[in-house]
Amino acid sequence: MAIVKVKPTSPGRRAMVKVVNKNLHQGKPFAALLDSQSSTAGRNNNGRITTRHKGGGHKQHYRIVDFRRTKDGIPAKVERLEYDPNRSANIALVLYADGERRYIIAPKGLTVGQQLMSGSEAPIRAGNTLPIRNIPVGTTIHCIEMLPGKGAQMARSAGTSAMLLAREGVYAQVRLRSGEIRRVHIECRATIGEVGNEEHSLRQIGKAGANRWRGIRPTVRGVAMNPVDHPHGGGEGKTAAGRDPVSPWGTPAKGYRTRSNKRTTTMIVQRRHKR
């Protein structure tokens, strides 16, 4: 994997920085593990915008990724590493000994030909998936389940990981990348190591058009709008917002907590916020 600063042949390429991985598969993805997905452009079933700044972009196939890793005791060989347009991490196509192929999130250091295993008897090696009760305390993990059998939901993006801090009864404590410490049932599964493509955050897209390829539309500032459109809008000429930053609906925009899921609050041992 290499970081390439593009030659400034145009204003759009002057600031562009790419992450190039020559180990990625250059051909088409595995067709049996593809699914079609239609773009909603941020609209709901009534056609109204529910998520702003979405629309357009290149059409993509969804790669069906195995987040459960339940084929216990069956060794799998990594056939190839692939780019996935739906996530920041790369994915790996693995071939199980029984002939089945599946996509998984590619951990850091994974190579073509490497053997992987899942289940309680799997060795503690990067890419192997085990129940948390079988993972030593202090191990770096990723792709962590929040409920047993539901599939990995935490620590899935490029370069992320978590650390197993302790086990107490039927729960374990896991420190996430944000600093949050969370309780997870020991029967939940996690994968050893950290997610690969850790240099993803160093890329510079260079031009607005690259965001349009990704289906991201422009974000208009509130102070550039009219009062009917935004609390920051209006005024003669260029003016400041005149109040603390808020969303178009008046919700504080800087540091205001919006989490409302009280049902799982008891699973959070330490919040990620400093205050």
UniProtKB/Swiss-Prot annotation:
SUPFAM superfamilies: Nucleic acid-binding proteins, Translation proteins SH3-like domain
Keywords noted in UniProt: Ribonucleoprotein, Ribosomal protein, RNA-binding, rRNA-binding
MF-aspect GO terms: rRNA binding; structural constituent of ribosome; transferase activity
Polar residues bias (residue ranges): 35-49
Coiled coil: none
Domain of life: Bacteria
Pfam families in UniProt: Ribosomal_L2, Ribosomal_L2_C
Annotated segments matching region Disordered: 35-59, 224-275
GO cellular component: large ribosomal subunit
GO biological process, one term: cytoplasmic translation
Annotated disulfide bonds: none
Biased composition (Basic residues): 50-59
PANTHER family linked: LARGE RIBOSOMAL SUBUNIT PROTEIN UL2M, RIBOSOMAL PROTEIN L2
Family: Belongs to the universal ribosomal protein uL2 family.
NCBIfam families in alphabetical order: rplB_bact
Protein role: One of the primary rRNA binding proteins. Required for association of the 30S and 50S subunits to form the 70S ribosome, for tRNA binding and peptide bond formation. It has been suggested to have peptidyltransferase activity; this is somewhat controversial. Makes several contacts with the 16S rRNA in the 70S ribosome.
Subunit organization: Part of the 50S ribosomal subunit. Forms a bridge to the 30S subunit in the 70S ribosome.
Protein known as: Large ribosomal subunit protein uL2
Organism: Burkholderia orbicola (strain MC0-3)
Lineage, opening ranks: Bacteria, Pseudomonadati, Pseudomonadota, Betaproteobacteria, Burkholderiales
Gene responsible for this protein: rplB
